[in-house]
């Protein structure tokens, strides 16, 4: 949906302009029903010379929106924030949070403006413009996002959805020639994001920090009523809410680990109450396997390293539990009552570790093409532990390993070359492969059926940093064809796509010098 000579629009007066873009969906108040202590109504700040970079067909389908609409000037005007459709109710929400383990106070929305809440056949979708300008919560920032980070978020949102990972979605990128100062001067862009809700742990932390229990209760009730109605039937609805968020978060992080995804900045304000992957910043997919991989060069202590993600998620859930504690307490509650509330919160969080472990083993059994053993998950630990140690020591490409593993034979090593050649120490591979083959033979594995099943869960294509970088470099020259091409490939990550073989290759040597940070 983009070309090398994009159409451009000139912003009208943001205070008065109304876009004529019609909506193929009804809207509802959504977050706006909470009232203005939770948000500020405002209009986006216009961007000059706006042009379409790309639109995601699968995300557009969620809204029932024809992709062809993206070529219309009114689409660009509305989704860059230059004008406000009559169906929109733009607002910025307020939240706080912990950053790198330290309380940081009020954080946002610093540059994201909710445009509307759509109600479609696929469910409720909050439509949000990221990079749409200053809000009352911007602190010292400029309210903008840059083309570089916008392309990364856009592509990864849709790639993760295609991989089956819980995630926010991305409808479009609209760029501008307006300069934005980061580590260097870059150009601005706006990503239109979609999610049932963008409520974060940090929304609850904000009102807990301000001791506004009424607002905290109202927010919790809103989440329960709209997204987790089963919690209403529980004896302790708020405890049930915390438990449900804990389970969803465990599922999400287990899936991250299985596909080799490193988020990079798991602050509590970047944690979705629905257990969605949110805020794609300095993320990365593993190339050579390194259990301690740090994808964010701003993370000097490795707090958010790949191996630390499950523990950090649990720590963040404790922050959410702390914020929700007042909902279990009556005014003037004594120490015994508080101890009881803490015990209830711990009880709600207790299932996290077991759920994470269960999902972790489920994903990896599927990746290995093996079944649950009679002895349960514990029986699989030696096979997996020895594999992870081998991958780590040999710096084996994570995605290529799993994809090629599907092709080996359970009978002998005659077909091992595609995966065996990834190892410097071939003898070490041979030793592990024999234990793996023994497992396959014990299960009387049918190689053809196993291969089909493994190829359906081990992607051939992921958003490696160098692929995103190539698309970004071309986009800076107003050539957006690589963004669209990469989006199309990543939308079918498990398919062979012979014409896209280059996107599945090992990273080039120059990719090792790429760094991503919180600068976006």
Curated annotation (Swiss-Prot):
Binding site residues for Mg(2+): 270, 279
Active-site residues, record numbering mapped to chain: 269
Annotated keywords: ATP-binding, Magnesium, Manganese, Metal-binding, Nucleotide-binding, Nucleotidyltransferase, Transferase
Sites where the protein binds ATP: 108, 110-111, 130, 142-143, 193, 200, 279
Disulfide topology: none
GO MF terms, alphabetically ordered: AMPylase activity; ATP binding; magnesium ion binding
Catalytic activity field: L-seryl-[protein] + ATP = 3-O-(5'-adenylyl)-L-seryl-[protein] + diphosphate; L-threonyl-[protein] + ATP = 3-O-(5'-adenylyl)-L-threonyl-[protein] + diphosphate; L-tyrosyl-[protein] + ATP = O-(5'-adenylyl)-L-tyrosyl-[protein] + diphosphate; L-histidyl-[protein] + UTP = N(tele)-(5'-uridylyl)-L-histidyl-[protein] + diphosphate
Cofactor(s) the protein requires to work: Mg(2+); Mn(2+)
PANTHER family for this protein: PROTEIN ADENYLYLTRANSFERASE SELO, MITOCHONDRIAL
Record function comment: Nucleotidyltransferase involved in the post-translational modification of proteins. It can catalyze the addition of adenosine monophosphate (AMP) or uridine monophosphate (UMP) to a protein, resulting in modifications known as AMPylation and UMPylation.
Annotated protein name in UniProt: Protein nucleotidyltransferase YdiU
Native source species: Cupriavidus pinatubonensis (strain JMP 134 / LMG 1197) (Cupriavidus necator (strain JMP 134))
Gene that produces this protein: ydiU
